[in-house]
Amino acid sequence: LDVKKIICVACKIRPNPACKKICPK
């Protein structure tokens, strides 16, 4: 279970400023 991966997927659905810090895109 990769928390960062889940967050990145959620960001694709609902973008969030925090996503940019955690995820490459």
Curated annotation (Swiss-Prot):
Its main location: membrane. Keywords: Antibiotic, Antimicrobial, Disulfide bond, Fungicide, Membrane, Secreted, Target cell membrane, Target membrane. One of its GO terms (cellular component) is membrane. GO terms for biological process: defense response to fungus; defense response to Gram-negative bacterium; defense response to Gram-positive bacterium; disruption of plasma membrane integrity in another organism; killing of cells of another organism. It is found in: Target cell membrane; Secreted. It comes from the Eukaryota. Disulfide bonds join C8-C23, C11-C19. The keyword Zinc does not apply. Antimicrobial peptide active against Gram-positive bacteria M.luteus (MIC=0.8 uM) and B.subtilis (MIC=1.5 uM). Less active against Gram-negative bacteria E.coli (MIC=32.5 uM) and yeast C.albicans (MIC=18.7 uM). Not active against S.aureus and P.aeruginosa. Has no hemolytic activity against human erythrocytes. Probably acts by disrupting membranes of target cells. This is Panurgine R. It comes from Panurgus calcaratus.
